Protein backbone atom coordinates (compact mmCIF):
# COMPACT_ATOMS: atom_id res chain seq x y z
CA UNK A 1 0.00 0.00 0.00
CA UNK A 2 1.17 3.58 0.60
CA UNK A 3 4.88 4.12 1.15
CA UNK A 4 4.27 7.38 3.03
CA UNK A 5 1.37 9.05 4.78
CA UNK A 6 0.60 12.67 5.55
CA UNK A 7 -2.22 14.08 7.67
CA UNK A 8 -2.06 17.65 8.94
CA UNK A 9 -4.54 19.97 10.59
CA UNK A 10 -4.17 23.74 10.85
CA UNK A 11 -6.33 26.74 11.69
CA UNK A 12 -6.98 29.40 9.06
CA UNK A 13 -6.69 32.58 11.12
CA UNK A 14 -6.59 36.28 10.32
CA UNK A 15 -4.00 36.57 13.07
CA UNK A 16 -1.70 34.49 10.85
CA UNK A 17 -2.54 36.61 7.80
CA UNK A 18 -4.78 33.91 6.30
CA UNK A 19 -8.19 34.05 4.66
CA UNK A 20 -10.90 31.39 4.42
CA UNK A 21 -11.94 32.77 1.01
CA UNK A 22 -8.36 32.57 -0.31
CA UNK A 23 -8.02 29.02 0.99
CA UNK A 24 -11.32 27.97 -0.59
CA UNK A 25 -10.34 29.55 -3.92
CA UNK A 26 -7.01 27.70 -3.83
CA UNK A 27 -8.37 24.24 -3.02
CA UNK A 28 -11.16 24.54 -5.61
CA UNK A 29 -9.16 26.21 -8.38
CA UNK A 30 -11.75 29.00 -8.56
CA UNK A 31 -11.87 32.79 -8.59
CA UNK A 32 -13.56 34.20 -5.48
CA UNK A 33 -13.75 37.79 -4.23
CA UNK A 34 -13.33 38.23 -0.48
CA UNK A 35 -16.01 40.67 0.66
CA UNK A 36 -14.14 41.25 3.96
CA UNK A 37 -11.10 42.93 2.38
CA UNK A 38 -12.11 43.33 -1.29
CA UNK A 39 -9.29 41.08 -2.58
CA UNK A 40 -10.08 38.69 -5.43
CA UNK A 41 -8.30 35.35 -5.20
CA UNK A 42 -7.94 33.77 -8.65
CA UNK A 43 -6.73 30.18 -8.85
CA UNK A 44 -8.49 29.32 -12.11
CA UNK A 45 -5.12 28.43 -13.67
CA UNK A 46 -4.48 25.83 -10.99
CA UNK A 47 -4.33 22.44 -12.65
CA UNK A 48 -5.04 18.98 -11.36
CA UNK A 49 -8.04 19.72 -9.15
CA UNK A 50 -9.63 16.31 -9.68
CA UNK A 51 -12.80 16.82 -7.66
CA UNK A 52 -14.35 19.50 -5.44
CA UNK A 53 -17.51 19.52 -3.39
CA UNK A 54 -19.15 20.95 -0.28
CA UNK A 55 -20.77 18.44 2.07
CA UNK A 56 -23.50 19.67 4.41
CA UNK A 57 -25.19 18.21 7.47
CA UNK A 58 -28.81 17.27 6.72
CA UNK A 59 -30.52 20.30 8.26
CA UNK A 60 -28.32 23.01 6.69
CA UNK A 61 -29.83 25.22 3.94
CA UNK A 62 -28.63 24.34 0.42
CA UNK A 63 -27.29 27.85 -0.28
CA UNK A 64 -24.28 26.87 1.85
CA UNK A 65 -23.18 24.65 -1.05
CA UNK A 66 -22.15 27.84 -2.87
CA UNK A 67 -18.43 28.24 -2.08
CA UNK A 68 -18.32 32.04 -2.42
CA UNK A 69 -21.46 32.45 -0.30
CA UNK A 70 -20.24 30.09 2.43
CA UNK A 71 -16.73 31.43 2.91
CA UNK A 72 -17.69 35.11 2.54
CA UNK A 73 -20.35 34.55 5.20
CA UNK A 74 -17.64 33.08 7.46
CA UNK A 75 -15.33 36.06 6.79
CA UNK A 76 -18.07 38.63 7.41
CA UNK A 77 -19.38 36.89 10.54
CA UNK A 78 -16.00 36.89 12.28
CA UNK A 79 -15.14 40.47 13.26
CA UNK A 80 -11.84 40.24 15.16
CA UNK A 81 -8.48 40.84 13.52
CA UNK A 82 -7.27 37.51 14.92
CA UNK A 83 -10.43 35.49 14.16
CA UNK A 84 -10.15 31.76 13.62
CA UNK A 85 -12.01 31.25 10.35
CA UNK A 86 -11.69 27.56 9.45
CA UNK A 87 -9.97 24.27 10.16
CA UNK A 88 -7.83 23.01 7.32
CA UNK A 89 -6.90 19.36 6.81
CA UNK A 90 -4.43 18.05 4.23
CA UNK A 91 -4.61 14.29 3.85
CA UNK A 92 -2.48 12.11 1.58
CA UNK A 93 -4.52 9.54 -0.32
CA UNK A 94 -3.35 6.11 -1.50
CA UNK A 95 -1.90 6.40 -5.00
CA UNK A 96 -2.79 2.74 -5.59
CA UNK A 97 -6.50 3.58 -5.57
CA UNK A 98 -8.42 5.09 -8.47
CA UNK A 99 -9.76 8.64 -8.27
CA UNK A 100 -13.27 7.27 -7.63
CA UNK A 101 -12.01 4.97 -4.86
CA UNK A 102 -10.13 7.86 -3.25
CA UNK A 103 -13.21 10.07 -3.55
CA UNK A 104 -15.28 7.44 -1.74
CA UNK A 105 -12.57 6.98 0.89
CA UNK A 106 -12.29 10.69 1.72
CA UNK A 107 -16.07 11.26 1.62
CA UNK A 108 -16.57 8.37 4.05
CA UNK A 109 -13.99 9.97 6.37
CA UNK A 110 -15.62 13.41 6.06
CA UNK A 111 -19.18 12.17 6.60
CA UNK A 112 -18.28 9.91 9.53
CA UNK A 113 -16.00 12.30 11.40
CA UNK A 114 -17.05 15.83 10.46
CA UNK A 115 -20.45 16.19 8.76
CA UNK A 116 -22.02 13.80 11.28
CA UNK A 117 -20.77 16.18 14.00
CA UNK A 118 -22.52 19.15 12.34
CA UNK A 119 -19.61 20.60 10.35
CA UNK A 120 -19.85 21.94 6.81
CA UNK A 121 -16.86 20.64 4.85
CA UNK A 122 -15.52 22.08 1.60
CA UNK A 123 -13.08 19.61 0.09
CA UNK A 124 -11.05 19.06 -3.05
CA UNK A 125 -8.86 16.26 -4.33
CA UNK A 126 -5.60 17.34 -5.96
CA UNK A 127 -2.85 15.48 -7.79
CA UNK A 128 0.11 17.75 -8.40
CA UNK A 129 2.41 15.12 -9.92
CA UNK A 130 3.28 15.07 -13.62
CA UNK A 131 2.79 11.28 -13.91
CA UNK A 132 -0.66 11.30 -12.37
CA UNK A 133 -1.75 9.82 -9.04
CA UNK A 134 1.75 10.16 -7.52
CA UNK A 135 0.86 13.03 -5.17
CA UNK A 136 -2.86 12.55 -4.71
CA UNK A 137 -4.19 14.30 -1.63
CA UNK A 138 -7.29 16.00 -0.26
CA UNK A 139 -7.71 19.49 1.15
CA UNK A 140 -10.59 19.96 3.59
CA UNK A 141 -11.88 23.26 4.98
CA UNK A 142 -14.33 23.08 7.89
CA UNK A 143 -16.29 25.86 9.48
CA UNK A 144 -15.45 26.72 13.10
CA UNK A 145 -18.97 27.65 14.23
CA UNK A 146 -22.09 25.51 14.07
CA UNK A 147 -25.00 26.72 11.94
CA UNK A 148 -28.62 25.98 12.77
CA UNK A 149 -31.29 24.84 10.28
CA UNK A 150 -32.27 28.49 9.64
CA UNK A 151 -28.71 29.27 8.50
CA UNK A 152 -27.89 31.26 11.66
CA UNK A 153 -24.45 31.12 13.23
CA UNK A 154 -24.18 29.67 16.72
CA UNK A 155 -21.49 30.18 19.36
CA UNK A 156 -18.17 28.42 18.85
CA UNK A 157 -18.03 25.28 20.93
CA UNK A 158 -16.00 25.40 24.10
CA UNK A 159 -13.48 22.78 25.16
CA UNK A 160 -14.91 19.76 26.87
CA UNK A 161 -12.55 18.28 29.41
CA UNK A 162 -12.25 14.55 30.03
CA UNK A 163 -13.22 13.86 33.63
CA UNK A 164 -12.55 10.92 35.93
CA UNK A 165 -15.22 9.16 38.00
CA UNK A 166 -14.97 11.91 40.66
CA UNK A 167 -15.59 14.66 38.12
CA UNK A 168 -11.96 15.84 38.24
CA UNK A 169 -10.09 16.82 35.07
CA UNK A 170 -7.74 14.11 33.84
CA UNK A 171 -4.28 15.48 33.12
CA UNK A 172 -2.02 14.44 30.26
CA UNK A 173 1.71 13.75 30.68
CA UNK A 174 2.43 17.50 30.35
CA UNK A 175 0.17 18.25 33.32
CA UNK A 176 -2.51 19.95 31.22
CA UNK A 177 -6.16 18.84 31.24
CA UNK A 178 -7.16 16.39 28.50
CA UNK A 179 -9.88 17.57 26.13
Segment roles from a protein language model:
Residues 1-179:
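N-terminal nicking endonuclease/strand-transfer module with a His-rich metal-binding environment
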Amino acid sequence: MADSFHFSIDIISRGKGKSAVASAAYISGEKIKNEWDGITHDYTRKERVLHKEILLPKNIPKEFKDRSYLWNLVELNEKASNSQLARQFIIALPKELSIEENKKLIEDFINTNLVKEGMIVDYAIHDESQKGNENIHAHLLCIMRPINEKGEWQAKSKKEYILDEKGEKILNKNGKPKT
